[in-house]
């Protein structure tokens, strides 16, 4: 059923009036241009850089590790916004937020929320605070200022932080690099920590949350943009193990 729903959602976007083919947008290329493009991609595929080699190695290691663990089969539901959301014409049942909470229900025991961009708004902050005050364990992980690639998002999130903490919500912020035990004189003097040489900083990109053994994994950030502007998709999986 989840696969059928995913296919149906894809086709609804593919066939929508707001979807355009590439030739409609940029015109058609010549046969010579197509041949050059094909040659470029073939050469690029053969020229693997160091990062791609590391990714391939990591994939092999992950595949090997996964074979050591049993597969936990569980019921899953594919949910998504309708293309009508873009026009402001979506019915309540065509909005992913309503679908999500219809399936997952109101948290009673616990809620773990991971969101790269976390801007709860007043309504969202009140919702999470009331859960925590009524005995539900609420934990949130989002990017720290240093890890966030959109500083203004952190600025909007920051104004809700104190209130959430005071109401019992547990907040965690992702660090872009691992702290060291020793710092240079410059870092001590300025408070600006320089990442280890050769290691780029990291940021949180995942979006998922768990409500009493039901897990959502998808593209939805806990922010107004995902709720009201973007069209988002995801899976709700009924699994205590997950």
What annotation goes with each model-predicted range?
Residues 1-242:
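Charged, low-complexity intrinsically disordered terminal segments
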